[in-house]
């Protein structure tokens, strides 16, 4: 069920275009997303603010609103609103994987919209892991990016904890650049190591203070660091 539209909403609906929630009343077990990096949500401000003020936590944006120049966390709140009920509430729960730049992790002082959203996610024990990816993976930007794993069905050993995986050296230099994309993560084909499988194992094993040397990572790029870590905190 693919829907074309503006996920956040503008309050200006038009034919063939879903303005706001394109899947009202629906919930999903798994969700993947790569929202735009650092894009302002000024066109959606009135619609989103009205939903926040009118519905609070019964709507999509109850925990707070980020600053106007970056709407990334609004997309995450939208996806969280689409989660299946947690197992302890009689449901099967959901898991979200979303790719962000560093802004949703670091911007916003205590009490700001970004800080309140992060606090709400962590206090409700939904942040399962953050995976730091290599830079230069995207065509239009060379920045470092991060995968957030968000879920309401944590395994018992993960409850109250967040796994941090530093995978910034899991990269393979490409022979030919494509815009700003100069690296890719190896998948075991074309003579590359299987970086994707290695990161998946680190995530699945949930071991504390795992350290891998550059030789073990098998990168053809001179890394800034001589180690990569998987940490649980």
Indicate where each model-derived feature is located.
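A conserved structural/catalytic subdomain of Rossmann-like adenosyl-cofactor enzymes
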Residues: 9-10, 14-233
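Conserved SAM-binding strand-loop segment of SAM-dependent methyltransferases
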Residues: 2-7
């Amino acid at each position: 069920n693919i829907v074309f539209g503006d996920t956040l909403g503008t309050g200006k609906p038009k034919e063939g275009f879903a303005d706001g929630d394109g899947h009202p009343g629906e919930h999903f077990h798994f969700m993947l997303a790569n929202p735009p990096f650092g894009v302002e949500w000024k066109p959606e401000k009135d619609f989103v603010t009205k939903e926040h003020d009118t519905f609070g936590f019964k709507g999509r944006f109850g925990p707070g609103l980020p600053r106007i120049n970056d709407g990334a966390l609004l997309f995450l709140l939208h996806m969280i609103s689409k989660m299946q009920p947690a197992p302890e509430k009689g449901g099967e729960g959901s898991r979200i994987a979303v790719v962000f730049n560093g802004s949703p992790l670091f911007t916003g002082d205590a009490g700001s919209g970004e800080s309140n959203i992060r606090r709400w996610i962590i206090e409700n024990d939904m942040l399962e892991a953050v995976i730091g990816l290599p830079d230069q993976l995207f065509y239009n930007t060379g920045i470092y990016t991060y995968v957030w794993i968000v879920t309401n069905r944590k395994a018992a050993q993960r409850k109250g904890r967040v796994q941090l995986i530093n995978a910034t050296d899991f990269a393979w230099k490409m022979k030919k650049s494509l815009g700003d994309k100069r690296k890719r993560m190896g998948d075991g084909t074309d003579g590359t190591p299987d970086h994707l499988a290695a990161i998946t194992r680190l995530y699945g094993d949930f071991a504390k203070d795992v350290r891998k040397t550059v030789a073990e990572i098998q990168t053809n790029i001179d890394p800034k660091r001589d180690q990569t870590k998987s940490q649980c905190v």
